[in-house]
């Protein structure tokens, strides 16, 4: 599953995600979820241990691994992503994730904040990720044209994600942990 975190009108996240999805489709079945197109319930309705299923609950639960494309906003990731993570707490558990971040300096602070949150959910984040510096300068007619070396960096992260996804799928099937 590939999750597009930004919901702003003027965003490059979807263009970056489309490029990531095309690369990931060589190794994975990609289910792209754009949070700008999903109506999540208000946080005040969230109940400990779960709430009302959302339009993406089954898609998150059914995925073995995640690619998260997120901007860095104010030295972290956007509230839309935090809401999606918190609302679907159990669905994320014991799986793997790779973060593709972007921002003026590559979005690495968003990645580091996500690592801590995902650790709480027992999500293994790959060591490799991709941080894209000023991706808005790499748009050509709305299509993301990656800078030199970005494809190779993403490829390395996808190899790690594939390894962790397989390992954790096997572990969940053979030795499930209680939630």
Positions of PLM-derived features:
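Short, glycine-/small-residue-rich phosphate/pyrophosphate-handling segment
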Residues: 93-139, 146-155
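N-terminal beta1-alpha1-beta2 submodule of the flavodoxin-like/Rossmannoid cofactor-binding fold
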Residues: 1-88, 145-155, 159-162, 168-179
């Amino acid at each position: 599953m590939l999750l597009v975190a930004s919901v702003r009108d003027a965003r490059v996240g979807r263009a970056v995600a489309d490029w990531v999805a095309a690369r990931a489709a060589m190794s994975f079945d990609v289910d792209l979820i754009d949070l700008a197109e999903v109506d999540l319930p208000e946080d005040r309705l969230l109940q400990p241990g779960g709430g009302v299923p959302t339009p993406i609950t089954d898609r998150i639960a059914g995925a073995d691994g995640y690619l998260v494309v997120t901007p860095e906003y104010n030295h972290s990731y956007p509230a839309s992503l935090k809401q999606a993570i918190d609302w679907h707490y159990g669905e994320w558990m014991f799986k793997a994730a790779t973060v593709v971040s972007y921002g003026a300096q590559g979005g690495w602070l968003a990645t580091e904040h996500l690592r801590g949150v995902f650790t709480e959910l027992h999500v293994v984040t790959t060591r490799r990720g991709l941080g894209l510096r000023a991706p808005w300068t790499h748009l050509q007619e709305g299509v993301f044209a990656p800078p030199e070396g970005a494809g190779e960096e993403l490829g390395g992260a996808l190899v790690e994600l594939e390894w962790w996804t397989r390992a954790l799928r096997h572990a969940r099937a053979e030795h499930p942990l209680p939630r």
